Amino acid sequence: DLRTDWPAGLWMYKWAHSTISNGVLISEPTESKKTINRAIAGFGRCDANWFHFNIETLPRILSASGFTEIGVPVLVQSDIPQSAVDAIVATTGREVIKINSDFLQVNELIVSQAKSATMDSVFLDAVNGVFTPASIASVRESLLKALPPGEGGNKRIVLLRQGSYRRIKNIKKVLSVLKEYGFEFVDIGSLTLREQIDVVNN
């Protein structure tokens, strides 16, 4: 079952169908427009989401990069933000190739299993619970080594995100009160990785 057994985690490239209750439909190419000899799989669940990318996708990329020779690129989904691309380049030094609607054939795809990263749910068994402190600490160390913090910014910040889920019903009132106390509002997803580090360096 590709929905649960795919080695990279939850398989995102599937479509629901009214006549299929326990299966998935996968678009299979009839021909390849481009071929790459080797590449690291740098995609997973909700990669365009800043939270999911940092605790799930990036640790798996770092894991695979650790035992793969220099020069092998990282494949990512085309919709990930520039800050995510910056993070991959800064921590691995590898070329990042965005996968668009064209089909790409990879002769050898290097996949780091989902259990090598922290998941945001208990979909996979985790010895230390939902969050693995060692995994998060490793990602933090890699990022700060590649991009050391600069000058500290405002001590009072509110991290905002664009999205239609898990919204605060009275967000306008909340922001109004926070503004009175001198908080700065930051859409973290719109910043580059360098800007993200500087914003929270306080």
Feature names for model-found ranges:
Residues 1-202:
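The feature primarily captures lumenal catalytic ectodomains
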